[in-house]
Amino acid sequence: MSLAVVTLKKGEGRLLKSGGLWIFDNEVASIMGSFVNGDIVLVHDFDGYPLGRGFINTNSRIVVRLLSRDENTVIDEKFFEKRVRDAWEYRKKVTDTSSCRVIFGEADFLPGFIVDKFSDVLVVQSLALGIDRYKEMLVELLKKVLAEDGIRICGVYERSDVKVRKQEGMEPYKGFIGEEFPTLVEIVENGVKYQVDVKDGQKTGFFLDQKYNRLAIQKLCKNARVLDCFTHTGSFALNAGYAGAKEVTGVDASHLAVDQATANAALNGLSDSVKFICEDVFDLLPKLEEKGEKYDVVILDPPAFTKSRSSVKNAVKGYREINLRAMKLVKDGGFLATCSCSHFMDYQLFTQTIGQAARNVHKRLRQVEYRTQAPDHPILWSADESYYLKFYIFQVCSDR
């Protein structure tokens, strides 16, 4: 059976030819042949030159997600096994694989498919219609590849409970893939223990992308007074406590997150030095300033303030506000760790926003480190969306 052919408009396809993996609806001139959304189609430029093959979905702004640049590639189980195997071999070289992101969508050439490994449990996100057809196969292939290294997976949980699926014509979904299992999973990262709630925690249950950024703050925290804002389940706060901080306060607006963070502190024997409070960070920081509170280290790990270009302006205001408030709470010569996980808040804009915040409160910033996401979340240079996490550590000094 012949595949449908997507032909691009004249002059379109430049991003695709330079390594991009997405074709948007406004780039398409015509679609010839019969297909059902989620099928594999061929892609040609305006002159009929073949550009590859991928999944089609005319319900989405991303009409085609490319799988291969060779239009003769057979997309079958053997094809997917190689992609899965390549992803795992890469992780074995670049990171501690006890808990890690095993598959990172487009950056592993498996568009829309994400898998996090927490000890012996896999958590899956399926974000695109085409890949959704293959998720059970991909899970079985991954279990097979891991088994070859002596890793037995005891359970798989799907966390596709995200709004982006609606843009693909799918409903959000979460549930077990295969047999049920206890959904609180204990992991160890940087020497710190966590209970990860893969069923009800945020996203897949734990933010593995900050692994080495959490490690980076440990050296600053011995005997320090630390404030960790947007703490979620306490990961930065617990790294500070593990490193010997004398007093750590973690703040989050979610009661569920604070309860889990408190349990994680107890799990590590840090309940005396690491405490958590449930409050909105934007409300709390001015109160702390009014009380004259000062900290050796302040950490800002907020959720994405923007998930589209249209809301970037408001996001800038939010990032500027929390950063200038945080700088006021840092002792002269103390440290600020600050980050953004929004792809649309790019490096340059984030840097400018922090600089503006520092000028507004008459602070000098001495950059200690600039970091991004952990290497199990690889940045594919031809896929801008794979680069999203910006993480700075600054020494904060008065400019007076």
Question: For each of these PLM feature ranges, what is it?
Answer:
Residues 1-119:
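Non-catalytic accessory regions of SAM-dependent methyltransferases
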Residues 103-116, 135-206, 215:
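Non-catalytic substrate-recognition/targeting regions of SAM-dependent transferases
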Residues 223-232:
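Conserved class I S-adenosyl-L-methionine
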Residues 233-246:
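Conserved SAM-binding loop of SAM-dependent methyltransferases across substrates and taxa
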Residues 247-252:
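Conserved SAM-binding motif I beta-strand of class I
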Residues 256-299:
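S-adenosyl-L-methionine
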Residues 281-359, 371:
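S-adenosylmethionine
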Residues 335-400:
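C-terminal catalytic and target-recognition region of SAM-dependent MTase-like enzymes
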